[in-house]
Amino acid sequence: MVAYPEISWTRNGCTVSKYPEISWTRNGCTVSKYPEISWTRNGCTVSKYPEISWTRNGCTVA
């Protein structure tokens, strides 16, 4: 029995059919709608602004 049928686990993480643009991976998740945003275990980075790195505690600017 699947507790959450809308969630589909894959080898590297899982996908949620309700939000196809979000793809969770082992290290975090990526959002295909916003490819410049990449979530990681500790927060997220924005490739458009590499100097900005969001973390669990807030954000840092290199």
Swiss-Prot record:
Residues 1-3, 15-18, 30-33, 45-48, 60-62 form a propeptide. It is a lipid-anchor. A lipid is attached at residues 14, 29, 44, 59 (S-farnesyl cysteine). Keywords: Cell membrane, Lipoprotein, Membrane, Pheromone, Prenylation. The keyword Lipoprotein applies. The record marks 14, 29, 44, 59 as: Not methylated. It comes from the Eukaryota. The keyword Ion transport does not apply. One of its GO terms (molecular function) is pheromone activity. It is found in: Cell membrane. GO terms for cellular component: plasma membrane. Its main location: membrane. Rhodotorucin-A is a mating pheromone in cells of mating type A of Rhodosporidium toruloides. This is Rhodotorucin-A peptides type 1. It comes from Rhodotorula toruloides (Yeast). The gene is RHA1.
